[in-house]
Amino acid sequence: MSYPGYPPPPGGYPPAPGGGAWGGAGYPPPSMPPIGLDNVANYAGQFNQDYLSGMAANMSGTFGGANVPPNLYPGAPGGGYPPVPPGGFGQPPPTQPSVPPYGVYPPPGGNPPSGVPSYPPFPGAPVPGQPMPPPGHQPPGPYPGQLPVTYPGQSPVPPPGQQPMPSYPGYPGSGTVTPAVPPVQFGNRGTITDASGFDPLRDAEVLRKAMKGFGTDEQAIIDCLGSRSNKQRQQILLSFKTAYGKDLIKDLKSELSGNFEKTILALMKTPILFDAYEIKEAIKGAGTDEACLIEILASRSNEHIRELNKAYKTEFKKTLEEAIRSDTSGHFQRLLISLSQGNRDESTNVDMSLVQRDVQELYAAGENRLGTDESKFNAVLCSRSRAHLVAVFNEYQRMTGRDIEKSICREMSGDLEQGMLAVVKCLKNTPAFFAERLNRAMRGAGTKDRTLIRIMVSRSEIDLLDIRAEYKRMYGKSLYHDISGDTSGDYRKILLKICGGND
């Protein structure tokens, strides 16, 4: 580049063809324009070219030079500046190439025209060939596929407005991309549906006859109540009292016993009231059935949990949160209270930038630190939407090479571990979660009958067909088969009726 007051470099550019201000016979001008040195005679000859070269070389050695690898920047079409010599700036240029087309070289004192690369910029400078942005504006981004300019060893500069992402092993940073993620669907395949041709008064009469006189026709009760939806059973209750002036629930209690009675009475409660009584039973007396609390609060919908709070307060004159606080403690208590709010995000959209942030925070709260920040797991697992968390679990697996469940097992223990695992399993695959619970209820010596009854009744109109399929897939035997082998009598009959068939 030529500047006024400096002699032209050796091998300078010959005049470009054509006329005009910057070419033709008038270029270069016969004399330099006045620049304030008019009184200095022969000023151009006063500068020693060797001195200039030596000064530049000295500066290059002092400040580290600016050695640029050859071919780092592509040349402009039709020619352009020659590559920087290996010795750094200030060295005599090599032989110049052929004359480029008109307009490629800048005017004296100017910059290269748009589209012609210049020397490597400083970090944060505009991409070569692009103008400086106006004050207050961010410089434009690099060309597609080109990394932002940085100092050696410096991490790439994030786009304007985006925070730099922390570095985690095996986890590349990503922008705020929001791809379309299909929403996770809840199961809606129950074994019990509304009976066709339903007549509540006729069913009330059938039940009356089954309990009248000496003995009880348990099979008639099983056939009637085991094939009606909960909504229809509530109508039977009303019709029974209307027709006979008696409470059907009291009659059933007086005629039935054992686990068969418990199953029939569970069928007669509304789903909300049934859960309220199950929670009450889980926390009353000595000891707490933590697994019951976890199962109910981790698997129910927001609407169900909000209605459960109302029903609990009505039935037992204290809030569900007060009941939880009185019988649990620590991080497990906080988990249950968070779940009992029924306030999980229910959107189906997934923002992958938020997914990546949650993955990083979970990793930093557990695997990437000494100890565990349980509150961070609680905040993410209890508030984010189902679709969002499924994406988080998949991304966590990709980043760490470890399933989120394995990380929870490594970082937590006791009731908190079981609670967090239940939340994750329900979000991943609710039918598989209940299939595992059913298998554990019947595994080994003895049967956890309350768990067996609760799951069979509460899921009978939601996803019991899906639970059956998962059970067969996970354990190689049908749910029907295992119930048959682990129960007996009328209790077995009503459970098999609810199960709806063998797989």
From Swiss-Prot:
Stretches forming Annexin repeats: 198-269, 270-341, 353-425, 429-500
Compartments, record wording: Cytoplasm; Melanosome; Nucleus envelope; Nucleus, Nucleoplasm
Gene Ontology molecular functions: calcium ion binding; calcium-dependent phospholipid binding; phosphatidylserine binding; S100 protein binding
Name of one Pfam family that matches: Annexin
Family: Belongs to the annexin family.
PANTHER family: ANNEXIN, ANNEXIN A11
Function: Required for midbody formation and completion of the terminal phase of cytokinesis. Binds specifically to calcyclin in a calcium-dependent manner.
Entry text on domains: A pair of annexin repeats may form one binding site for calcium and phospholipid.
Official protein name in the record: Annexin A11
Organism field: Oryctolagus cuniculus
Gene coding for it: ANXA11
